[in-house]
Amino acid sequence: MIIIPAIDLKNGCCVRLEQGLMEKDTVFNDDPGAQAVEWQRQGGEILHIVDLDGAFAGEPKNRSAIEAIVKSVTIPTQLGGGIRDIATIEAYLSLGIGRVIIGTAAQRNPAFVKEACAKFPGKIVVGIDAKNGMVAVQGWAEVTGITATELARQFEGDGVSAIIYTDISRDGMMQGPNIQATKALAEAIKIPVIASGGLSSLQDIENLIAIESSGVTGVITGKAIYSGAINLAEAIALTKKQR
């Protein structure tokens, strides 16, 4: 189990949203590069970056902040938000981003995921965000009629590195991840699943470690480490004990 610290970017700053609502944002740091260095210093093994403005606009919006993060750290990075075409993937990978996350475009155009995986093997992650089990897209502004499991199954065999599963109702609410839904998704597919949304305590991490054998390989944390509810270094030490 790998703990993955998140940096969510809005207007060039590190922010956290509640349940994906852009108007419910809290700025935690106006220097994303410095924040990235801090998470690396505490033992972060991968950084999760989200271009929130990009997710809503459907095109990259925080390039200079993303560049600052990549230049500041030596650990791998993964980035999502507004990635809708091959050219954008290419641009981010050449910038030094390790893996890109396809979200809305994966639901709207599954063939795009297949094409991206063929062109950039090992570099493509699919982000599936769900509200009451149904996939939400366009920065979570629109809920579709397809379930998370139905969507995830479409990518079996495409070469997707991982699926990031976010339960929107838990995101930023500090109520613990949706263990049941995450486990059910991981058991339904062969692709490794990374949990996201709601992590609030070391107990939550223990609960996720308990379902690791189902195929849950990591967890993304944002608000909990920014607010101090979880100490990142302690959380990482806990997972390393189990490895």
From Swiss-Prot:
Top-rank taxon: Bacteria
EC number(s) given by UniProt: 5.3.1.16
Family: Belongs to the HisA/HisF family.
NCBIfam families named among the record's database cross-references: 1-(5-phosphoribosyl)-5-[(5-phosphoribosylamino)methylideneamino]imidazole-4-carboxamide isomerase, PRK13585.1
Keyword Cytoplasm in record: yes
Keywords, alphabetical: Amino-acid biosynthesis, Cytoplasm, Histidine biosynthesis, Isomerase
Organism, as annotated: Geobacter sp. (strain M21)
An example Gene Ontology biological process: L-tryptophan biosynthetic process
SUPFAM superfamilies assigned: Ribulose-phoshate binding barrel (SSF51366)
Reactions accelerated catalytically: 1-(5-phospho-beta-D-ribosyl)-5-[(5-phospho-beta-D-ribosylamino)methylideneamino]imidazole-4-carboxamide = 5-[(5-phospho-1-deoxy-D-ribulos-1-ylimino)methylamino]-1-(5-phospho-beta-D-ribosyl)imidazole-4-carboxamide
Stated name of the protein: 1-(5-phosphoribosyl)-5-[(5-phosphoribosylamino)methylideneamino] imidazole-4-carboxamide isomerase
GO molecular function per UniProt: 1-(5-phosphoribosyl)-5-[(5-phosphoribosylamino)methylideneamino]imidazole-4-carboxamide isomerase activity
Pathway given in the UniProt record: Amino-acid biosynthesis; L-histidine biosynthesis; L-histidine from 5-phospho-alpha-D-ribose 1-diphosphate: step 4/9
Subcellular location: Cytoplasm
Pfam families associated with the record: His_biosynth (PF00977)
Active site positions: D8, D129
Protein's UniProt keywords contain Isomerase: yes
GO CC annotation: cytoplasm
